[in-house]
C-alpha cells in the first residue's frame, strides 16, 4: 500500500479497551455544546476540515464524550479521529440520500447487510426501520464491535448482529491498515501473520441464516471486488440484494469487478452521492 497507510495502533483496534459502560445519557450535551452543535449544523462548519476541529472543540467543552441521537438512534461520540463521528454529530442530513435509497420500499421484516459498519451509521437506522428483520453489521476492526453493540443497545435494538471480521474471496488472516489517522478509513492487508480473521460473505450469510437480503451497503476501502463479486455470482436469486449502496473509487467510476457482476445480474445504476453509487435490481 502507499505510504499514507500505516498499521493500526492497539488503541485504534483493541475492542477490550472499550471500558466506558456508563449509562447512555451521562454524556448528553450541555447548553454551550448544544449551541455550538446547532451553529455547525446550520453552517459550513459541519463540512471539510472544519468538522474535525469543531468536534474536538465541542467535546472539550464538556466531559470529553457526547451521547447524541441521529435518525432516532443513539450514538456515543468519543472524539477520536473518525469522520463518521463528525457527520453524526454535526450534519443532520449526513448520508441521507444513501440511507433513504436503501430503505425505500422496505418493510418491517427486511434484512440488511452493512459491510464496513464502523459504529453503526447505516446499521442502526436500517435495523430500526425493520424490527422484525435482521441487520448484520460486519467490520474488520475489533474496536468497532464494542462501539456498535453499545450504540445498538442504547438504541433499544435487538435485531443487530455484529460480525468482527474482514471479508474477501477466501478465508485467511489479515493486518489492518489506516489512512489519514482516521479509524473510518481502514483497509486490510492479507497476511499469514495477521490477527484479523478473513471470511467470505457467503459463509457469513449462511451462518446468519438469511433467506433474503433487501439492502446491502459496502465500504471497505478498495476490497469491494474481492468481497462482493464472489457472493453475488454464486447467490440464489432470493439472496441477491434488491438495493446496493457501494463506495465508488472516483466520482463517476465504480469498481470494475462489481460493475460486471451488476450488469450480469440485472442491476441498474440508480444514482450517486458524493461517496457512493446506488444500484437497484428491479
Q: For each of these PLM feature ranges, what is it?
A:
Residues 4-5, 133-136, 203-282:
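Conserved acidic-Pro-Pro-aromatic motif
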Residues 117-119, 142, 169, 220-224, ...:
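Short, glycine/acidic-enriched loop or turn micro-motifs at the edges of active sites
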Residues 60-62, 170, 190-192, 263, ...:
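Residues that act as N-cap/strand-start positions at coil-to-secondary-structure junctions
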Residues 71-99, 158, 163-211:
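Glycine-rich adenosyl-binding loop in Rossmann-like folds that engage adenosine-containing cofactors
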Residues 66-67, 193, 236:
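Short secondary-structure boundary/capping segments
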Residues 126, 148, 176, 227-231:
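Hydrophobic packing residues within well-ordered alpha-helices of enzyme cores
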Residues 2-141, 146-151, 155, 206-208, ...:
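S-adenosyl-L-methionine
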